[in-house]
């Protein structure tokens, strides 16, 4: 299923000022590794901004939570500590249910359906973000999600008590319904959490599996 979307956010005031100001330098925190396709896409965005502004707006990309951790990025942009950032917005669904619009299981099960869902939600999402002083710049869907475990899973009983990495309210609820223990872990911390046993299972895309070399810690997808 297509279960989550990563968004690029900026402060409305700074975005408006950036077009007129010369030689602006911005920081853009991203939660994912440098070779993750969301980060690669963000770098293409940064390069395009530099080109179309003739170098008057130069954005430095900070990958893998190196400037701000994933759960700090949205707030950092709101407070002006970062002028722009990319964030998995469904992680903030507890703040406003609109932010979790794309995390309902099986609501969108293809990229086309994900695009349609994004378009349907855009107006309401923009309104909520604007009220917080934020502007939505672009959104990118993740590939289909799957469950990663370190053992065969034949029934719900096999999942009982497993520490499960959750990244939003929906994945925490999935864990609870399956009898697992939801544990909030950001993407940049996932590899260490798996290696140290802080979590022993999670739901994510094949892209994340490659980023984190999950086969070194888990055995079943």
Where do the PLM segments sit?
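Secondary-structure junction/capping motif
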Residues: 3, 36, 123-124
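Bacterial N-terminal signal peptides that target proteins for export
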Residues: 1-8
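Signature of the catalytic double-stranded beta-helix
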Residues: 115-127
